[in-house]
UniProtKB/Swiss-Prot annotation:
The gene is ecfA1. Coiled coil: none annotated. The keyword Cytoplasm does not apply. ATP-binding (A) component of a common energy-coupling factor (ECF) ABC-transporter complex. Unlike classic ABC transporters this ECF transporter provides the energy necessary to transport a number of different substrates. InterPro entries: AAA+_ATPase, ABC_transporter-like_ATP-bd, ABC_transporter-like_CS, ABC_transpr_CbiO/EcfA_su, ECF_ABC_transporter_ATP-bd, EcfA_1, P-loop_NTPase. This is Energy-coupling factor transporter ATP-binding protein EcfA1. It comes from the Bacteria. The keyword Glycosyltransferase does not apply. Forms a stable energy-coupling factor (ECF) transporter complex composed of 2 membrane-embedded substrate-binding proteins (S component), 2 ATP-binding proteins (A component) and 2 transmembrane proteins (T component).
Amino acid sequence: MAKKTKKINVKLEKLNYISLKLTDVEFRYRENHPNAVDGVSFEINHGEYVTIIGHNGSGKSTISKIIIGVLRPQKGKIEVFGNEVHSSTITGIRKFLGIVFQNPDNQFIGSTVRDDIAFGLENRQIPQKKMQAIIEKAAAKVGMNNFLDHEPLMLSGGQKQRVAIASALALSPDIIIFDEATSMLDPKGRKEIKQIMVDLKESREKTIISITHDMDEILNSDKAIVMNKGQMVKCGKPHEVLYDEEFLKSIHLDVPFVSKVVDSLRLNGLKVKNTLNLRELVDEICQK
């Protein structure tokens, strides 16, 4: 009679307050192909809001898949709150993580918003009354508490993404990853989701990691990590990244030129002077 495989269920503790640490991480999709992630090292403290930016193919989305354990690097080390990520700890590690993807339509499986927010809680053996309280609290945090009995697919893009965020929040993760979470939304939807990200940042209760091309998200973050050809080529405060106009052009951001940056800021309610000098613009942004 074949032996049953014993399921490993490791409960992990926070060993330090470094939410995420990558050390010399390398990953390639196929043998003899160049590394999609090539010797990347960085650390993110708990409560920080960090953006990971770069053009398509730069390695930023590969990093997000490595963080959540979908991909395993060939070299290097990944730690979440001091716990090294490997096959025997990944189940425990994932309890620290929540992720919101680019297309909210791919995340709905229930017949109501309540069902979708509850997805993931069902395996946690939570009493029904407590589960409903968790669902309602998560929905209220993103302004969707009046939509709990609505059909998800009838919602707007911004509302769907808010439900996806509520679903992540219901699991009470310490780290939330937004993987291009605003890129498929209309301007109203983008504004709604970016405000939720800012609110989460201001609470400092969670670490926010956003894979993005969006200038507003970059400006709102505490730190920007810039990827190019699989390597981390710059890491610093947003204004440190934005000082270099040629650098912005080289990574093909959606709004790489100063005039477009000014327009983007004005559309989001920030009054800035006309200028073609990136340093002047960044200095002005940082004073506001």
